[in-house]
Amino acid sequence: MAGDRAEEEEGEAPPPEARAAAAVERVAAAVEAVAAGAGAGAGEYRNAYRRQLLALSRRIRLLGPFVEELRERRRGEGEGEEEERALAPLADALEAALALLRLGREGSRISLVLERDSVMKKFQGVILQLEQALCDIPYNELDISDEVREQVELVHAQLKRAKERIDMPDDEFYNDLLSVYDKNYDPSAELAILGRLSEKLHLMTITDLTQESLALHEMVASGGGQDPGEHIERMSMLLKKIKDFVQTQNPDMGPPMASRVLDSNGDSRPITIPDEFRCPISLELMKDPVIVSTGQTYERACIEKWIASGHHTCPTTQQKMSTSALTPNYVLRSLISQWCETNGMEPPKRSTQPNKPTPACSSSERANIDALLSKLCSPDTEEQRSAAAELRLLAKRNANNRICIAEAGAIPLLLSLLSSSDLRTQEHAVTALLNLSIHEDNKASIISSGAVPSIVHVLKNGSMEARENAAATLFSLSVIDEYKVTIGGMGAIPALVVLLGEGSQRGKKDAAAALFNLCIYQGNKGRAIRAGLVPLIMGLVTNPTGALMDEAMAILSILSSHPEGKAAIGAAEPVPVLVEMIGSGTPRNRENAAAVMLHLCSGEHHLVHLARAQECGIMVPLRELALNGTDRGKRKAVQLLERMSRFLVQQQEEQESQSQASAQVPPQATPEQVPENDIPEQLDSPASQYPMVV
């Protein structure tokens, strides 16, 4: 029996060459997983350790050729014991590194900073483990080429240096986060602290905030549905403070199609979505609200994804869900529809169900579209022009046409016509793209086709109508947060600023709308300021006709949150016109003017702006705004009143101090005024005894 067991155990042990091959596959799998993560984009590491994570990822990816040579190596019978002994520690180290990189990509950004000591120990441990594993590799026995060996040795040298100096997040950042986490900070400094945190944590967009919220939910779920405890509750509180701050600074941050409507004049105006209409997971307006077994309501797509990920607890309450059944919340859906109609918005459409496919084009319609696309490829300019014009009209007509035209492959063909020497063809093509971009799915197709440089080319060089429609196309595309980055990085902003200065009234409006959307992204604000946007905007604000006043004030409010923008606005002597706007503007312009003033009075030259505001009589309109303004306007007015009050108290104290100092200094007689033998003995002699100096 014992002999049988020994034979069985010997049979289970794989030969050395098999173990070596398994170790190679572990190493390869880890390196490939890191490379796949890097393919998702460097922006995935949007946290305080971005630089360290990118460096670690880059060094591991440099091991790719080493892995390829290991895989190609042939092993003879009995070989592999030393190879397995050398590669097993490397596989362990790479798997630990992969886990750390995943934490950096998917973990809570707030938690990563609060746990910085633990995180830095993980970095040190992984780097030390990798450095030691690479040091012990027997290159000669593994038959590695000299070129690959040099590359691996380079990685080893980099890790050796990195082991000796691993930078931690700066102390100010950590202390800011800790002070809000512990609720131990000066309330007057709260806005400045939250501003620094939102920027350094990369929590500036609705996408970032949603991702962080999901990461915190994941931390709770990984605890087995138990009480999340004070630590996670306090992090959730901290995230809510940052979210409130970011939405206060950029009230139009949310999904633009849900948070901006057109007024009776056709102008775009922002609108705040009530919290009870937002999904607790995505923070977006719910299209298809459903109730889970705990009584909480979520957007159907979000909660289905949560459940499909293996979670069995309610994201909000952390109670275990007794069933995964979802009940439509018809009452809330009706309330959302009524609210949308009251505010001039189109009620949100529920996602199309798989068993209810979107109606396709009829065969005759598809044949017509295909014929037009063939003409777009024609060498005859006249045929190209007429086909582009007809597609432009078809895309304008209805949503179904937009879907069919895009599915037929029109987008790349229209893009090729943006460089046409025929200005009318170019104009029809860019306008057709504008009409196609109205459909949400087409936005992604246009961007992924590399459209932005071609659209910017038209914006710079086309006819005035083509330039205006190019600006409108960029506005349509820029409602998606990720596309703001793409468009801003490809030279669109300076061209939009030029159009804002020299276009027709419609062109200026389209340029202003696009610039507003793009400047919601913090990285684009500096580009716009350096392109000369602030002087143009100040010109619109002071224009006696009031044309584009709403757009100008909205853009000014966004730019004032940027240090360069604050400086440029401050240099334009804005205080008198802002005070006048606070007193007599429209409700939205009053709140934006107050927001700009608040930024100016928080900056480097705040005393100058506070003094100028006092001279212009800001207190009365501020008090009125604090009582009767919009919600955001009231908040800004109250904050400004507090700053003005502190400034006035400080001024009064300085004046009183100067008066007291003057009163304590006795009059000094000089030899020219009083002869030496006439100097009185008493210091309190009547002033009339002294000669008057004129």
From Swiss-Prot:
Q: Name one Pfam family in it.
A: Arm
| Keyword Protein biosynthesis in record | no
Q: Which UniProt keywords apply?
A: Cytoplasm, Flowering, Nucleus, Plant defense, Repeat, Transferase, Ubl conjugation pathway
Summarize what gene deletion causes.
Lesion mimic (spontaneous cell death) phenotype. Expression of defense-related genes and enhanced non-race-specific resistance to rice blast fungus (M.oryzea) and to bacterial blight (X.oryzae pv oryzae). Delay in flowering time under long day (LD) conditions.
Mention one GO molecular function. Answer: ubiquitin-protein transferase activity
Domain U-box, which positions?
272-346
Where are stretches of biased composition, namely Polar residues? 350-363
Query: What are the record's GO terms for cellular component?
Result: cytoplasm; cytosol; nucleus
Primary site of residence: nucleus
Quote the biased-composition stretches of kind Low complexity, using this chain's numbering.
650-667
The record's region (Disordered) falls at 1-21, 343-363, 650-694
**UniProt cross-references to PROSITE patterns, sorted A to Z:** ARM_REPEAT, U_BOX
Signals that turn on the gene:
In both incompatible and compatible interactions with rice blast fungus (M.grisea).
User: Has the keyword Transport been applied to this entry?
Assistant: no
Q: How does it assemble?
A: Interacts with SPIN1 (via N-terminus).
Task: Write down the PANTHER family for this protein, in alphabetical order.
Answer: E3 UBIQUITIN-PROTEIN LIGASE SPL11 (PTHR23315:SF236), U BOX DOMAIN-CONTAINING (PTHR23315)
| Name listed for the protein in its UniProt record | E3 ubiquitin-protein ligase SPL11
| Organism in which the protein naturally occurs | Oryza sativa subsp. japonica (Rice)
